[in-house]
């Protein structure tokens, strides 16, 4: 009896302190992607289906803003696994983290509404991959939201990752106009924050 009480307490503590279902679902998404056919075209669009459940809702009974980002995570996990991108990053002893994202909401997703997340690798530079993800309503093919993200490669470079995948050097596609503008915005923001940090540190030294 005592063992069951302690076990229940431990499980309750784990669920209280960790987002357990995020890790469980993420692992299941990757496992499923591993047994699905390999997507050899790195630039091919990948579709990942979803449905709005009660725990996804906000006070207005729409899918809440944070859930879009969460669902986009799972769609990227599936795409990067099936395309071999995750495997290539690990093979090179590198890592990959989200370095920035921008999302634009165009139409709400409601309870029990189905949607597709269409993920595309757009381009890359010497530090990061740039990925677009569209939340599309299958009933009318309307883009309900669009997410642009920067996936920063740590310990290596996107060029080397792609070369490892394709067994040859591959040039990045030309940057779409909106991506080029977004990169400039991020660079300007970084410079501004560095300048503010330098001023703050200088003031502390005085």
Curated annotation (Swiss-Prot):
Residues 1-26 form the signal peptide. Its main location: secreted. It comes from the Eukaryota. Glycans are attached at residue 64. The keyword Glycoprotein applies. CDD domains: 4HBT (cd00586). It holds the Pfam family 4HBT_2. It is found in: Secreted. GO terms for cellular component: extracellular region. Disulfide bonds: none annotated. Keywords: Glycoprotein, Secreted, Signal. Coiled coil: none annotated. Belongs to the THEM6 family. PANTHER family: PROTEIN THEM6 (PTHR12475:SF4), PTHR12475. This is Protein THEM6. It comes from Xenopus tropicalis.
